[in-house]
Amino acid sequence: MNTQETMMNEKSSGVRGFSATVKFVALLLAVLLPLVPIVMLVVKLPSTYHESFLGELTYKFNRLKDTDEKKIVIVGGSSVAFGINSELIEQYTGYKVVNFGLYASLGTKIMLDLSKVNINEGDIVIIAPELDEQTLSMYFNAETTWQALDCDLSMLAYIDSENYGALWGQLPEYLSTVMDLFIKGEKISPTGVYRADSFNAHGDIVYPREYNTMTGGYDPTQTITLSGEIYDEEFLAYLNDYIAWVEKQGATAYYTFCPVNEAALHEDTSEESIREFYRYVAENVNCAVISDPASSILEQNYFYDSNFHLNDAGVTVRTAALIEDLYRAMGRTDLLSIKLPAAPEPPKQEGPEYWEENEWSSLFIYEDFADGYKIVGVTEEGKAMESLEIPMKADGKAVWSLTKDALVGCDALKELTIRENITAIESGFFSAAPNLVRVNMYRTEAENLTVDQANLFDGANSALKIYFDSSIGYTNFVTGYFWANYGGMMVRPEE
């Protein structure tokens, strides 16, 4: 055998050896990952996220697991958590109800998987994901999943094994955070609506939500498009496999549409485009679509802090409509006697008196937005600065929002300060300043600052970090509905 043949054989052997090693490692991970609960029990680390919004998942999972009576299981994201009165559905249908919606950043796939813990003959499963490309895809977030599993690691057994690799990769960071908090004697204890005790036993959010808190009545970072293009084909196949599984258990699957803020609809939305959207869903989802998307579009004053989250009045309107849809699907002709509340008028948003103009106010360019301003640019003087602070007021009006192109031309900018007045930041805002590496966040509440949960920092400097002036601010953001996905960029203050 000549030298060249020897080398080729050695290479071939090396490739086979590498391939075998990869297969062995993959098999090892599949075997070891289910052992994590045992390791955690041995170490006896306390639950870290049980008071957080994600901590609610274990209660939803166990309610479903323990409910053997005939039941209605509503599977989806946070629009289900914020949009259903389960007791009202029980009253009018005679079924037990499990609200099995929580958080878009977990993804719809994991909620479908976990719901398999206890679906039986005679049950009804209503599938109601948000109308968003992320929730209508195979999206899986290992970081938020670990936080949600924190209270009950037995849920690992119901997660698709294809996601084990992502979970394993995220495990060191999760354990590091848990150990760090344990050593310091600290815990994750957020304030506001996004915490576990905002839910009742059914899994509905019962935290008081009197009116729409969004500046201008809608979230400008989240335009809603009613089109078949928002559905991922792989997700549709997975969803239809799930529907087939539900039917195999002797249960019935229905599909409905989540509530949609009329003010947030894409400008091209029309009656015809809505009908075409319905036709697409009805043709591609292998179960009865029991709702008309047009009836899911509600006026803005029925919403709370998101274009998919309802306030208390909106919950009643949405639940009554869902019961009517169920009645039609079940062949019932009963008349409903549910009093529908009027949409509550929110108070005028002006900002407190202590918000003042300062030396920063003259460095930005503004456009009118919701009785105040949004920032759309920076002056030439401001573009030359390495540090900027977003003002609270300008010309006597509150500054509410930051648009995606506001920092275009700010190549010198390295540090930016944001205070409590800002209620929305559009994706692209941070990437417009390529050298920005430090954001000082001087606010404690995260729920009133809406951002895109997946793409906010796309294109931004990879070294960018968010610094907080208080531990409660850090906690509320790192566990916050809109901000939790960016927890790895957040720096806990040293106090």
Where are each of the predicted segments found?
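Extended hydrophobic/aromatic segments used for targeting, binding, or gating
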Residues: 241-247, 253, 257-308
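Histidine-centered active-site loop/cap adjacent to the catalytic His
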Residues: 306-348
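Membrane/wall-proximal cationic-aromatic binding patches
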Residues: 32-95, 105-113
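Membrane-embedded segments
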Residues: 75, 79-159
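Secreted/periplasmic serine-hydrolase-like ester/acetyl group-modifying domain
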Residues: 142-249, 341-344
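Structural signature of tandem-repeat unit edges
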Residues: 363-372, 383-400, 410-424, 434-450, ...
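N-terminal Lys/Arg-rich, disordered targeting/topogenic segments
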Residues: 1-21
